[in-house]
Design a protein with these regions (language model features):
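Conserved glycine-rich
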Residues: 116-117
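Short alpha-helical Gxxx[C/S/T] motif in the catalytic ATP-binding
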Residues: 104, 108
Length: 144
């Protein structure tokens, strides 16, 4: 993704606020697919000359929360409740120019939910979007 971002004149920042001792149980290839899809959407719909993508990883109780924020065109409030629905595309004219089948975020949602997590988004048009997902931390079961 790094070369792709460089070619698109995008900056990427990564902030990890989680201790190295914290573990999750997850399929690394599937989580990579989730992150690649979300960042790919940020790149695809970026409308700024100097786009930014920030990735933050936080420890939130029993979960690890990942936030992927961009400063792109954003998603209309009327579309936000549906972006994880299979085949949903926000604007037909925009999507025909950028391609895509409208199933990427539905697959992302399934992967996260299959890992016992949750995914959601906030967005402001012309300001950007933040995609959030949480994955449960690994916790040892005490011996009795």
């Amino acid at each position: 993704i790094g070369l792709e971002l460089e070619a698109e004149h995008l900056g990427l920042s990564y902030f990890n606020y989680v201790s190295d001792e914290v573990l999750i149980i997850a399929d690394p290839e599937q989580l990579k697919r989730v992150i690649d899809n979300i960042i790919g959407n940020s790149v695809k719909y970026m409308d700024k000359e100097h786009g930014l993508i920030n990735i933050r990883i936080k420890d939130v109780g029993d979960f690890i929360q990942v936030e992927i924020e961009d400063n792109g065109k954003g998603i209309a409030q009327k579309d936000l409740p549906f972006i994880f629905d299979r085949f949903y595309r926000t604007d037909a004219s925009r999507n025909s120019a950028t391609g895509g089948s409208g199933i990427g975020l539905s697959i992302v949602k399934k992967i996260i939910e299959d890992h016992g997590g949750k995914i959601w988004a906030t967005s402001k048009e012309s300001t950007g979007t933040v995609m959030y997902f949480v994955i449960r931390k690994y916790q040892e079961v005490p011996n009795e």
